[in-house]
Amino acid sequence: MEHFLKKAKASASELLRIDGAKKKSVLLQIADDIEKNSNKILAANEKDMALAREMNLSSALIDRLFLDEKRVRSMAESVREIAMLKDPVGRVLDGWVLDNGLRIEKVSIPIGVIGIIYESRPNVTSDAAALCFKSGNVSILKGGKEAKNSNEAIAETIQAVLEKNDLPKELVSLLPDYSREGVEKLIKMDKYVDLIIPRGGEGLIRYVSENATVPVVKHDKGLCHTYIDKDADFDKAVAIAVNAKVQRPGVCNAMETLLVDYAIKDEILLKLYEAFKPHMTTLKGCALTKEVLPDIETASEEDFHTEYLENILSIKVVDGVEEAIEHIRKYGSGHSEAIVTENYTTAEKFMNEVDAACVYVNASTRFTDGGVFGFGAEVGISTNKLHARGPMGINDLTTYKYKIYGEGQIRQ
């Protein structure tokens, strides 16, 4: 492990020597070769899918693991979008001149070596590698063993392009150890690794956060809420709620709990019930919800703490926006929260008082995504407050240094 990381660290200096045009060219070649190697990648993915079915993995995990030609094309297109982004390295973030004539510039630079730990989504391999490369960082990728074959096929494609361009393949590396011990070693290698970004289940995030000596930016669980206020447009509210839950239930920006204002519960809950029925969504409600919808399941305290990642929804009736905010404060994960209302004052209160990376008015939480935000892609959605928060694009994979230009000044 140490020898592997030492080689990765040594390769970082190569990225400092190439300009934005070269990085763009390499990434466009990677995108082309991902499409050219589609058959190889899909064959590898089919091996992973067969093993996943044998292991009876959840439908959410299998959905994230699955690749088809459309998803492979989407991976390639994501790399192209990253290639076309403005180079985040070398930006002058601030600058000033002191009274003694010293000129100071605050300039963006790469972080260095970034370890990314993730589970069953093969597209993270290409996205993370491309984002790190574009931002001048070496990437150490630790995917889940359930996606081993897919990740290896994608990484081999990327490394072949690097070598064709006389760049070390170690700029993008898969951690060779897929075990828990491999993660344990990686997160303690602060001599070689500058940042760890874990994305996955709650257990993984907690383990990494509690045991790492390398700095960590967490991609924690997405226990997302939508609150339907008494001043909501009902048609808008129903459409947003259904989209937030059922469009893709297995992702971190899907809604897990729906909060409904007591003042409108009788009418809106019936509309919501009819809207969710065609999607076969399992609804679980509090006592007040069950007064209106007696046939649904009862929501337990544990349900309100649960990120289902399935087509299951908890519903709670609350006494206005104050209680909605309090509920989110208690159960939310700091990811994405939404309010549906036509009342500007209520909307602003919610936006200002809810503590989350992304807070929405009259829109689905499903929009929390680096690609949607215009970042090209994301390496994760940070629920940290430092050093990055929300969808992490290439600018969030940089730090800065101060460059000071003098003409012989000495300090008196």
UniProtKB/Swiss-Prot annotation:
Pathway: Amino-acid biosynthesis; L-proline biosynthesis; L-glutamate 5-semialdehyde from L-glutamate: step 2/2. Transmembrane segments: none annotated. It catalyses: L-glutamate 5-semialdehyde + phosphate + NADP(+) = L-glutamyl 5-phosphate + NADPH + H(+). It is an enzyme of class 1 (oxidoreductase). GO terms for molecular function: glutamate-5-semialdehyde dehydrogenase activity; NADP binding. It is found in: Cytoplasm. It comes from the Bacteria. Belongs to the gamma-glutamyl phosphate reductase family. HAMAP family: ProA. This is Gamma-glutamyl phosphate reductase. It comes from Nitratiruptor sp. (strain SB155-2).
